[in-house]
């Protein structure tokens, strides 16, 4: 294992030992706030230290077993044991590297996913509908239940815009890299001359922030409008003004919700989406201040970023951030999205580790 990583682990082990001494003092609980801070740090380091100590034990076992290779009677047994030790050591090293990576506090949360048709007119709306179906299928594979917050239907099918919530632990960690511009290349059904058209859909995935952590919103900053819910083709599906449109005047953000028959439920959902959007904007602003908007291989998540191309003529899908191409387009569109998500996560972890080593 890299000496820089080993030195960092030794430093964390020493810090862990210091924390244990501090937390075991009789008066440690006197300052409850400070005690909680130390306890959280102790809990965070605990798994790393336990894993590192296992690595040190195996390292010593390897040294001891290598000495047995000189013994003719023990040579074969020692070789078999070494194979097992090397395998265990490699697995532990992989875990340690992941444990050392910076954590995203939002990774344990559910998420909102917003899809908007871009350039391409009717075909873009159809493509947006197909992408949403892909996420629905993926949610079914994961046994997640997806809740539609608001939908604006396309003239020939699909959606001009659709917002959904996936209120399941860890959903954000898997879907956050879907944010960005998605491009499709194919011959539309309405194309009589067989020309390939390009259409786009922009996607934003934001964490579902618990109500207690949402930013406080001044009611005076909100403009709330009511209207009748409408379905596909624009027909009204409700005779009462149950749909809600909330405008946050200072930021210009607008959220609509017409999924529920109750105006109060629609308002609550819309406020939840608005709060999460405002939180995401604030978090992004803070990250930009710290990192000076340094772009890594996974992009910034801006909706203008073209992250992926779907080529139906060739059955090919390419993620441009990691130069990854798969010819399993049909499988991915039918919910096997992990074929794309896992390579992106692995590359992201590798990139984070490289940055960690650069900082040492």
UniProtKB/Swiss-Prot annotation:
User: Is the keyword Coiled coil in the record?
Assistant: no
Indicate yes or no for the key word Cell membrane: no
Q: Where in the cell is it found?
A: Cytoplasm
SUPFAM superfamilies cross-referenced by the UniProt entry:
Release factor
PTM comment for this protein? Methylated by PrmC. Methylation increases the termination efficiency of RF1.
InterPro entries in the cross-refs: PCRF (IPR005139), Pep_chain_release_fac_I (IPR000352), Pep_chain_release_fac_I_sf (IPR045853), Prokaryotic/Mito_RF (IPR050057), RF-1 (IPR004373)
Name the UniProt key words of this record, in alphabetical order: Cytoplasm, Methylation, Protein biosynthesis
Question: One Pfam annotation, family name?
Answer: RF-1
Residues annotated as transmembrane: none
- Which NCBIfam families does this chain map to? prfA, PRK00591.1
Biological role stated in the UniProt entry: Peptide chain release factor 1 directs the termination of translation in response to the peptide chain termination codons UAG and UAA.
Q: What is this protein called?
A: Peptide chain release factor 1
Give the classification, highest ranks.
Answer: Bacteria, Pseudomonadati, Pseudomonadota, Gammaproteobacteria, Enterobacterales
């Amino acid at each position: 294992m890299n000496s820089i990583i080993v030195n960092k682990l030794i430093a964390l082990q020493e810090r862990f030992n210091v924390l244990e001494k501090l937390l075991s003092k009789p008066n440690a609980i006197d300052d409850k706030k400070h005690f909680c801070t130390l306890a959280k740090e102790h809990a965070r380091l605990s798994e790393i230290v336990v894993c590192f100590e296992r690595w040190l034990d195996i390292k010593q076992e390897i040294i001891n077993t290598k000495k047995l290779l000189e013994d003719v009677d023990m040579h074969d047994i020692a070789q078999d044991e070494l194979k097992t030790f090397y395998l265990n050591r490699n697995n532990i090293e992989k875990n340690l590297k992941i444990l050392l990576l910076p954590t995203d506090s939002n990774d344990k949360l559910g998420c909102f996913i917003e899809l908007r048709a871009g350039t391409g007119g009717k075909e873009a709306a159809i493509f947006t509908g197909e992408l949403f179906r892909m996420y629905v299928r993926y949610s079914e594979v994961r046994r997640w239940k997806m809740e539609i917050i608001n939908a604006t239907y396309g003239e020939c099918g699909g959606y001009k815009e659709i917002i959904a919530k996936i209120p399941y632990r860890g959903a954000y960690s898997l879907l956050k890299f879907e944010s960005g511009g998605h491009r499709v290349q194919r011959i539309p059904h309405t194309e009589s001359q067989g020309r390939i058209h390009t259409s786009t859909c922009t996607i934003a995935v934001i964490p579902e922030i618990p109500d207690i952590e949402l930013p406080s919103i001044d009611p005076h900053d909100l403009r709330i409008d009511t209207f009748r819910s409408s379905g596909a083709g624009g027909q009204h599906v409700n005779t009462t003004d149950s749909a809600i449109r909330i405008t946050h005047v200072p930021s210009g953000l607008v959220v609509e919700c017409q999924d529920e028959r109750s105006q109060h439920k629609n308002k609550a959902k819309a406020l939840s989406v608005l709060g999460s959007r405002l939180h995401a904007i604030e978090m992004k602003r803070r990250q930009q201040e710290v990192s000076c908007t340094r772009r890594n291989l996974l992009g910034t998540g801006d909706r203008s970023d073209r992250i992926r191309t779907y080529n139906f003529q060739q059955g090919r899908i390419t993620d441009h951030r990691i130069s990854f191409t798969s010819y399993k387009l049909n499988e991915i569109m039918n919910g096997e999205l992990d074929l794309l998500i896992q390579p992106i996560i692995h590359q992201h972890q590798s990139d984070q580790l490289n940055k960690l080593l650069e900082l040492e």
